[in-house]
Amino acid sequence: MMSRIEAYQSDIAVLMDPETVLLPDFISALSYAHELGRDWLLVSSSVEIPRFPFHWDETRHFWRQDNGKRVRFRELQKMISLRSLQSNSSASKMIMAWNNIDMPLHCGVLPPFLYQRGTHNQWIINEAMSCKRRFVFDATSTISSFFLGNAENIYNRSDNVSEPKTRNWEYVGNSHLGQLYGSLYSRSYTLPKLLKCNRRYIFVSASERSTDLSIPKGKSLGFRTREKISACITRTKSRSLKLDFVQKDETVPPLKFPFDLESLLPLVADKNRTVVLSVAGYSYKDMLMSWVCRLRRLKVPNFLVCALDDETYQFSILQGLPVFFDPYAPKNISFNDCHFGSKCFQRVTKVKSRTVLKILKLGYNVLLSDVDVYWFRNPLPLLQSFGPSVLAAQSDEYNTTAPINRPRRLNSGFYFARSDSPTIAAMEKVVKHAATSGLSEQPSFYDTLCGEGGAYRLGDDRCVEPETNLTVQFLDRELFPNGAYGDLWLKEDVRAECEKKHCFVLHNNWISGRLKKLERQMMKGLWEYDASMRMCV
């Protein structure tokens, strides 16, 4: 978020939540700050209003009461001021504004915080104070802003997302990042306040015992004016920035938190009880994050990560991911040699089918996607349209003229499975077959669901498993191409070629070795993550 702001050409930058409503005094305060003659950072908390009692008139220029009477600006200010005394302002709905955006806000390295998941705003303010390059002040008493109470509980207006307060792992991750970077957990402070009294902007020191009026040089104030200003300061001192600063002796939550698969599923799943699952080890952590960043950009929040090792588990928490650890995952996973066909690959892939089966039995549909599958569009609406008793899977067939359901051409790195009796029974057979096989799970999928040698094939794009009556639908390769189909990865502009075909995804497979896979995806511009900054790009 901060990087995006710095990319703009502007005299003043403002970072705020889109649900926040600003009144005209915000512009007045900015104009005053702009004339300070030094670099500054303005911060202000917004007030929560459970129900806004006014409505727009037909011109959409004025608010009016139910009786049609126009609401004046001072009435709105009074309502906000009274409400601020009755409820806490929201740190997540804070407004931050600063000048000279070419100069950094602080001297530290910004952690990969998830915006609006706690700690971020406190960290920015603390580091700006520590850096001492800017004058940091609290303008809460001067700026009138509010948000509706229900807006605080909305993560996204899509029905496919859950409320942020349930996504506790994101707050825990931010808290730990705040401890690892900077000095937030080693100091506390209060900010000087900007007030407007007797039509004058003045700064009041943070000390409760004295008021330091910042009056321009060469000007003096009469006794009556000073009396009015003192009374104004007394009235407004209660309105100030409200942040949950961590005290020096306060301990942060443990990095391991009580979320297992069963507890994460209802928090992450969309309204159709569907989750997107990926399984990853530490060697693929950067590719995992590129995959996550892409899903976030596509506004697909209902994903889960199964960590194969403790390093991936902790890394995922710090990145704000909904992650669970598989205690039965194979140990000693090779860092560079866990590619297709290797013994390591064979052991790792069997974790995926076991996990999918467990999720299906818990009553949730699963889209299993390897992290090397690049998403151009959200495929869930299409995949869910296949209906019950259908497992939709990518085809690994590269020959453009051959049937896409040829033997051993079912790709177990991208498929959609419903939580219904035929699918669960068929997946149990796949897991049982893979457990006794010396190969990866991929041959077990085909031999079980399509029969050895393709005995259960139906036409050129389907199979029907006779005992469970499950239909396997091989996905159109124009929309779901594998890594060898149409030589797409050899095109100069892979993205343009895929978008021309209206691809949903492109699998980065049919290439051996982790480093080659990473290089190809980065060089072709299908990479969404900056590993040096641990942030999405």
Swiss-Prot record:
The keyword Glycosyltransferase applies. Its EC number is 2.4.2.-. One of its GO terms (biological process) is cell wall biogenesis. One of its GO terms (molecular function) is glycosyltransferase activity. It comes from the Eukaryota. Disruption phenotype: Reduced growth of primary root. Delayed flowering. Belongs to the glycosyltransferase 77 family. Beta-arabinofuranosyltransferase that transfers specifically an arabinosyl residue from UDP-arabinofuranose to the monosaccharide galactose or beta-methyl-galactoside in vitro. Catalyzes the addition of a beta-arabinofuranose residue onto a beta-galactosyl residue of an Yariv-precipitable wall polymer in vivo. This is Beta-arabinofuranosyltransferase RAY1. It comes from Arabidopsis thaliana (Mouse-ear cress). The gene is RAY1.
